[in-house]
Amino acid sequence: MDSIVTTEDTIAAIASAISIGKGGVAIIRVSGKDAINSCKKIVQTKSKYAWESHRVFRGFIQENKQNKFIDEVLILVMKSPNSFTGEDVVELHCHGGIIIVNKVLKILLSNNSRVRLANPGEFSQRAFLNGKIDLTQAESINQLINASNARSAELAFSGVQGEIKKKIDDIKNDLINQLCEIEARVDFEEDFTDFDYTKYLKNIKKVKEKIELLIENAKRNSYIHNGISIALIGKTNVGKSSLLNLLAKKEKAIVTNIPGTTRDVIEVNLTINDIPMKIIDTAGIRETHEQIESIGIKKSFGKIKESDFIIYIYSLEEGFNEEDKKIIQEIPKEKLITILGNKKDLIDCKNINSNELKHTILMSIKNNDGERLLIDTIIKKCGLKQVENINIFLNDRHLTNLSACLSNLNDTDEIIENKLPFDLLSIELRDGIQNLSKITGQELTEELLDNIFSKFCIGK
């Protein structure tokens, strides 16, 4: 994206979805000081409300000076500062379809040398630069547009309403209060009694708990928006493909009694309990000299690294043996994992070793016995059991800055513990406040802002 825009430019773009190609209405948005005049050049209207702010009126798009009309439109005018961008904004509501809306946009641009096509996210960027929204609200708008499920949309909308900023400002105000007390002591030390380190540490602990809760929620709501990738891992013929078919409610993978039937990765996207999940069926892991099967097994280990969650499946008929233990040792310790003992219908569960039962979900995939328990276990281990308590969506940028702030606060603990110079507390608190300010967009470079908004769609 180009460098930060100036209000000398007037920008235009299609603001409605056109990927399907057809629709009842398509919208062109125009923003800038020439927005109204540029639209007047291509619109003919007899409405008495024409070009008044916050009025909708009817008009016709004129292709040339011979009064050839190509579409009948509704025009909505929003004059500065009472618009999304804070500038003069005009919206042309055309008939839907790629052909007509592209033609209207082309006529608008060709008749106005001071109007150019908007860059991705440029309308939202102008709204941010003009103080109409903070950066978290702008990002939440983009998140809302790209929401993959209803719960993700709810979280994004809370950000649009300013809920992220409220939480960040609350933490920031706590730190500002601590900073004021410390800097007053540094500047006017003779006017203060001994500093109450215990009280300070208690206050900072409360702030850290707020940040840690936000960070923990950020990891959970990433699952809500992006989904949980779940790899089905195990030896051959333990029921991985059967479990994939059960969860998908249709036959996605071939199931036979022949070991090594699944030789490649099969992925299925599902939504379970309003949470998107990608179930990945992998080749059974075993010693083999068959080249194609070996490639599939290598891919299985690759999917272990890529996935958020591992379901390790073994056969209760065979029991959990040394070969299973060896495979599980290859799974990184930080991975979320649950162990599933399949084929419970073929054995007497009373004969299973009690230590084995402690960490195993018993299931008969063939008889659909245990599916609910498996799903509940996945949701619980991913921290999504109380998903209704997660009320904002935090992205990776927010998480990075929150983690940096938490690191600053941990450093203040070390300063006190090691009896380092008192003014170092002030430095760390200032850095922590600055990291929080970056979240809402108060401490960001132009280059970083450009990068953030370039990920938005063109009409937003």
Curated annotation (Swiss-Prot):
GTP binds at residues 237-242, 256-262, 281-284. Residues 227-383 form the TrmE-type G domain. Signal peptide: none annotated. (6S)-5-formyl-5,6,7,8-tetrahydrofolate binds at residues 29, 91, 132, 460. Exhibits a very high intrinsic GTPase hydrolysis rate. Involved in the addition of a carboxymethylaminomethyl (cmnm) group at the wobble position (U34) of certain tRNAs, forming tRNA-cmnm(5)s(2)U34. Keywords: Cytoplasm, GTP-binding, Hydrolase, Magnesium, Metal-binding, Nucleotide-binding, Potassium, tRNA processing. Mg(2+) binds at residues 241, 262. Its EC number is 3.6.-.-. Belongs to the TRAFAC class TrmE-Era-EngA-EngB-Septin-like GTPase superfamily. TrmE GTPase family. Pfam families: MMR_HSR1 (PF01926), MnmE_helical (PF12631), TrmE_N (PF10396). GO terms for cellular component: cytosol. Gene3D superfamilies: P-loop containing nucleotide triphosphate hydrolases (3.40.50.300), Probable tRNA modification gtpase trme, domain 1 (3.30.1360.120), tRNA modification GTPase MnmE domain 2 (1.20.120.430). This is tRNA modification GTPase MnmE. It is an enzyme of class 3 (hydrolase). Its main location: cytoplasm. The lineage of its organism: Bacteria, Bacillati, Cyanobacteriota, Cyanophyceae, Synechococcales. It comes from the Bacteria. It is found in: Cytoplasm. One of its GO terms (biological process) is tRNA wobble uridine modification. Its cofactor is K(+). Homodimer. Heterotetramer of two MnmE and two MnmG subunits. GO terms for molecular function: GTP binding; GTPase activity; metal ion binding. K(+) binds at residues 237, 256, 258, 261.
